[in-house]
């Protein structure tokens, strides 16, 4: 569709007119529909009328948009919309009048509201008529909406038509309806209490004095509005009644009342209430206007026993809920774990899911169980036997055999057991009946764990301060009764009688529970009675919800509410204690506690506010209130101040004096507060003593004393003396504080453990390893004494189990701390002397925990025993950690004892112990428990013993720790179920050193076979160590600078001279850092050696990339800068650079044809040479050179000589021996003596003679060194390449002057190569050199044929020729002797080709072609040989098909390619094969990256092509364009060319002509010059056009002399003159070269 708009057209106007027309049609349609709807409404056909109205409101001009707005507005539209809404409102009203009796109340209200909605909407579009306002006024009056009724009345009065009547001009025409509305309005103003308006304003405004005294008549209601009015009155009556919530109580108890009230509110966490300071009541949807309690009779008659069981179940559920975020603590009922919370809910399907559903005989089943039990116990029997044997090696008495150990658990009942077996059987029973209670006890260790900062450690001491207070509290007799029912009954009665709001009931409940119930004595329910724990939580929840309101209330009524304030203060302090305890538990478990700390801060802030308020209320006159307040304040100080804070002592002193002065018999239990101890005079005095004692034994001195270290040592010494005196009373200790001894001796067992933990942790913090170990063994002695004490034996099973698990937890914590500090010291031995009895204690402790493993094995066959590891994953995990820690300590101390007592057998004994322990733990799948401490120590110890046994176990360790699988023929590690960890740098160094020493066993890694199985581990070790060159170490930086400076220096004669005298050095300095030992051992060197070996393998399969060498170069440089003085590293570094150079030279010629890229290769080549030079210098500087050193440096000499040759000859052409300064400009003195600046140029730093001498020196030394090595090692195989390279270089540079010496080296190389290479794949290069040298010497006349054959016969073991082959017929002429000699040379060269299995050798074939062409004149034979190397006629893209042999110099490949193409072109020119030459030209254009000097080759090939074509086809040079084309008649040319195109048949012409024309035309198209024009035009005219033109001329009139004769082939005729008698014609058009080529193109398209 066209988008063109005429200038005189108005698109918008046209659209507007169309819309206006459409709108007018819609308006007309709307009025018609409205008329139909009114007719139906008049006929009371409500269904049709309703459908009409629905149709009406679907029309756009009537229907508003989604926002209630209209797009267009006009008087007509406003009138239409008014009528539509007005009449639909009347429709709803009329419908109600006719159908109200059939409608229910809801339908009636909905319908009348629709009428109101439509009528009100109509008023927005136009002034309403009186019928609308009158109906609305009546409806509003029926709804008793006085304001709306007044509004609609005033709307009617203010209408324009009524104003004109009311202003007096037509007052007599005032209608009765309006008068009635006015009277009703007067009544409304009286109801709305607007006397001014009703008395004065309205009558003055509208002059209605005469109506003032008329009694207003009420608006008449129809039956519908009367019914609505009645419904409205009923609703108002209902709204006046209170919404009473009937709360059903299950029993008459405070906790039931509190729970019922809480259930009325939405559930909100207490932590949320603390943070948000909100009242949950604000979140309810409907207000609670009144509360009434009802007692459920059915549940009330339930026996109390059932209710008690329900309460216990509820407590269990609550504990299970708390299990997710709390850890174990010795205090019961607070903390659960999620693993043992439901010990009795193990499903049968979990137990029996693996059992086969089949029947078996009982006898068979019993026998099977016995056999399986024996198999299960085999691991224990084997361990006990091996372990006791290992103990005997270090002269330690065996612990016991397995049968003795097992007998502890199979003796009869506990009362018949020996006393020493009781702890074992108790532990066995705990495991058998493990529950959540045991988890709580076992997983607590807050009394031992030291804080990460000073405040946490002080909190630990505060816990010590509280410990006895709570123990004393628990010792109170349970004389407190539950809350009695009298108070609750009175409370329920008061609430039910008063119709109280929820706020009133809640506040009244708090006053009852927290306030006083005996005003005279200040007695409180929360102090005098024992509450349910749930009640206390709900009360606290209520307090946090309305705390700010209560605080404001109490602040206004201090005297009346003082005990309520005290109770709230106590609740907050107790809750602070709960939060602090939970923070401690989470810290112990390593969980985050930021939210809890935030709660703690907010609660502390609230407590301080209440404290300030209570300080205003409480005074010493009110003794009881004052004592309670001070005691609670003392408890608060324990959580907020240090143990040495003077406020603690001052508060206790004040309390003590007050109690003594008032009532010494004061005894308050605080039964409902967990964190507020019982209050009496003895408790206060006990707390004072504890503060003094604890301050004396506090490890950290908080004061700013300069002698704090001395005080700390004194405190530790005092505490240690007291604890040791209690542990060993017979020991005499001077200066013992008897009061402290008595206090600690009489303290509970838990406090003693905590004090030992404080002493132990203090030494740990001071990193005093000897003291830590000494205290650890004292603690083991203390624990053993506790479990064998009479108190333990006489306790009931419940008490023994609790004490036993506490001991296990303490041992586990201390063992973990000891292993941690020993690990931080890298398990180095200290001056601590381990006595035999100490080691025996450690063994006894380990085998006590061994009960767990024995039980786990017993559970396999005993149905009554459930697996502890599967049932309690968290607790069993901790148990595994403890056992691993103990085993780690045993291994550590065993290794120390073996080192002292049996140093010769230390490695064997320690390795066997690791085997035994690891096998045991691996069997139970937890050898990596306790963060892999056992594996860590085992790895460290095994790395000290370099033997195969240790390596086998180390393989197992590496799998279990890092999941490194090292395969071997005789051992494969067991795949234990462990979690792999990342290797750390501190572990990688000794492991790498160990692997190197084990792998090479003092052998030189360079000459040893590399084990690829260890490469993964070595790579990971190197990765963890990182790049040392990036370390912030000035020595490393200096060494790196010196290394880089050396690699950027030029190659000079002095450098070469110093190299072979061992005088070249970098003068590096050893960093002697943490990596020095590993570097000296060869970590980076061996890793780079392995990586380079892998690179070589990949390089052979052409899968390697030079970028892989970057990491190897980096590792070798790191090895060098650590001053390892290892010449092997320099050799490897040189090899890396050599491989980079080789890769750049062998693939494409681009990098050797572009100068910039060639400079980069030269730079790398120079680095390789420098590396080899440094390696040789280090070798010659060594005084003690081993035979291994000689073997290695022999390879370096060969590599250096080869690299020098590569840099000296093409294609590099001595570029690496030139050097350019890094500066762009240099300053020099000119001839006139002036200082001038010029661009820096490359300079050659060494002469050709010195380079050649260096090459000779390298190979000469290599040859002599080979002989020296051979004399020392008969097995050594001489290196043929040294002799070969020396002979080849000598041959090239000598010019035949020393041919005998060259021949000697060549024959030696041939002999060594023949002996060292397999017969199936022999080395070709030295044999070819011998043949080629003899050929060239004979041709140059250096030697005769007889001498040459004699030399060649020395290699007859390779050529395998008959004796007569080597005989020369001297009777022949010299030229015939040479010819026969050349034939023999060709035969030998063909033999070389025949033994080349890879078919990579191409030089012999080239030499054959060259001899055939140059010496024998056999062009076709030579061309046949070259055709096997050059594929000019094939579709293959490559022009020269040769491969680089292994020993060919990199880059020489492209030089050879150039030589072969030059020879091939010479051969083609010799036979004038221009078509083949053209094919070579076509391929040569795309073969640019396959050879050098491609432009020179192209020029040569084009010249050969054109000359060959002109000679062979006898074409004229340039005559076609300059002479023939101007003489051609244009019309005649078109005619003959067209005829030629029609009659052309490729088969009628020789292949050489048709193919030549096509090829010449293709070459002309692909070339921008005119080089191929003459050949293309010549073939066209001479062989196609002119023959046809001559044939056509013979058919014309031979008598017509005016027609010019056509030029003959190969001749040029003069221009023909036109006939002078002919008439003038148009100017003759000349035939152009383009037109000729267009005709050629048509013919070429037909040639296939």
UniProtKB/Swiss-Prot annotation:
Q: Where is the composition biased (Basic and acidic residues)?
A: 339-353
Q: Where is the composition biased (Low complexity)?
A: 1611-1625
Ranges annotated as biased composition (Polar residues): 1597-1610
The cross-references to InterPro entries, in alphabetical order and at most eight, read: Hir3/CABIN1 (IPR033053)
The record's note on quaternary structure and interaction partners says: Component of the HIR complex, composed of HIR1, HIR2, HIR3 and HPC2. This complex may consist of one copy of HIR1 and HIR3 and two copies of HIR2 and HPC2. The HIR complex interacts with ASF1. Interacts with RTT106.
Q: What does this protein do?
A: HIR1, HIR2 and HIR3 are repressors of histone gene transcription. They are required for the periodic repression of three of the four histone gene loci during cell cycle as well as for autogenous regulation of the HTA1-HTB1 locus by H2A and H2B. Also has a role in nucleosome assembly.
Q: What is this protein called?
A: Histone transcription regulator 3
State the organism's lineage.
Answer: Eukaryota, Fungi, Dikarya, Ascomycota, Saccharomycotina
